Each structure stands twice: as structure tokens, then as C-alpha cells.
Curated annotation (Swiss-Prot):
GO terms for cellular component: cytosol. Residues 179-199 are annotated as: Disordered. Residues 189-199 have a biased composition (Polar residues). Belongs to the peroxiredoxin family. AhpC/Prx1 subfamily. The active site is a conserved redox-active cysteine residue, the peroxidatic cysteine (C(P)), which makes the nucleophilic attack on the peroxide substrate. The peroxide oxidizes the C(P)-SH to cysteine sulfenic acid (C(P)-SOH), which then reacts with another cysteine residue, the resolving cysteine (C(R)), to form a disulfide bridge. The disulfide is subsequently reduced by an appropriate electron donor to complete the catalytic cycle. In this typical 2-Cys peroxiredoxin, C(R) is provided by the other dimeric subunit to form an intersubunit disulfide. It comes from Trypanosoma brucei rhodesiense. This is Thioredoxin peroxidase.
Length: 199
């Protein structure tokens, strides 16, 4: 599967762009500096909208769960860093972001969203793309939602843990796998242990 320059099991498109950081400062965020860690990169259409703050706040509030498994979370839209900052100064009960624990990239030229294949050309905004990048900076997962539907933080965290399990143990994760549940060997004989125990 590919989206723009983003292809599964290929290097994630590089970026080095200014972001609003959790401490309220502006700083360039270079994907290369995250080598050795897992990364969740998610795009959203616009600041000061409706579904977007529900997603961003969920990822921000739960970022420690990602950090605990050596994963960083980065948000991105086409808005400026100043717009991001203004949005964090609006309280959540009024649709703002409040305090953030994750960086928010300011993709003003739309180069990142083009590279990742999430630009909705007719509106000039990003679809709700989400990408999981492994420590070698290869893309392991790509999902893109149309604008009206938000994403599931639990499922994103589950996927990160599943890919990590596969990397560490060499077995594959069946449907609805969660840490601690059964996995299987990816061969005709080894997989029978799983199937016989589940059916």
C-alpha cells in the first residue's frame, strides 16, 4: 500500500518542520531525531474545528501510555504554529486544546501532507491520516479516514504493541490481539497450535 511517497515497509517520508511544542515554544521537529523509537504521526484537517480537538486531546492525554512502550506521538495540520498556540489558549470546554503533551507540526506549505498522501486537494486540508513508524523509520501501518470520523486511540496503541511483539518474538498477531493473548507461528504446522486452542 502507498499514499503519496508513503509506502508500507519503506522509509517514512522525512520532514523537518516547525512545531508547537508541549512547553509552548516553537521548535523544528526532525523525523530523523526519532530514529530508535516508534512514532505515531497523525494528521488532522484544521485548528478550531470539531472532531479534531477530541482526537488531539485524547492522544495528548494518553501520550504516557505510548511513551511507556517507547513510542512518541506527533500531530500535524496545515495551520501555522501561531494558530496552534492560539488554540491551546482556548479552554477545552469551549472547543480548545488546553495544555498539550505532544508536538503539533505546522505544515504551512502542505509538503508533509503531500508526501504522506493525505492532502484533500479540493479543500487544501489533510484527511485524517495516521501512520505508525518503526525504530528504523519504516512505515508499518497506514490508515486514512474521511473528515467526519475520528480515530481510536486504544486501537492505535494496540497496533503499536502488536508490531512491537512481532519484532521481538517473530510470531504474528491474530484479529483482536492484545498483550498477553495468544499469538501464532506464521507457518502451516506452527499455526495449528493456535487454531486448535481457539476452536
Amino acid at each position: 500500500m502507498s499514499c503519496g511517497d508513503a509506502k508500507l515497509n519503506h522509509p517514512a517520508p522525512h520532514f523537518n518542520e516547525v512545531a508547537l511544542m508541549p512547553n509552548g515554544t516553537f521548535k523544528k521537529v526532525d523525523l530523523a531525531s526519532y530514529r530508535g523509537k516508534w512514532v505515531v504521526l497523525f494528521f488532522y484537517p484544521l485548528d478550531f474545528t470539531f472532531v479534531c480537538p477530541t482526537e488531539i486531546c485524547q492522544f495528548s492525554d494518553r501520550v504516557k501510555e505510548f511513551n511507556d512502550v517507547d513510542c512518541e506521538v506527533i500531530a500535524c495540520s496545515m495551520d501555522s504554529e501561531f494558530s496552534h498556540l492560539a488554540w491551546t489558549n482556548v479552554e477545552r470546554k469551549k472547543g480548545g486544546l488546553g495544555t498539550m503533551n505532544i508536538p503539533i507540526l505546522a505544515d504551512k506549505t502542505k509538503s508533509i501532507m503531500k508526501a504522506y498522501g493525505v492532502l484533500k486537494e479540493e479543500d487544501g486540508v489533510a484527511y485524517r491520516g495516521l501512520f505508525i513508524i518503526d525504530p528504523q523509520q519504516n512505515l508499518r501501518q497506514i490508515t486514512i479516514n474521511d473528515l467526519p470520523v475520528g480515530r481510536n486511540v486504544d486501537e492505535t496503541l494496540r497496533l503499536v504493541k502488536a508490531f512491537q511483539f512481532v519484532e521481538k518474538h517473530g510470531e504474528v498477531c491474530p484479529a483482536n490481539w492484545k498483550p498477553g493473548s495468544k499469538t501464532m507461528k506464521a507457518d502451516p504446522n506452527g499455526s495449528q497450535d493456535y487454531f486448535s486452542s481457539m476452536n
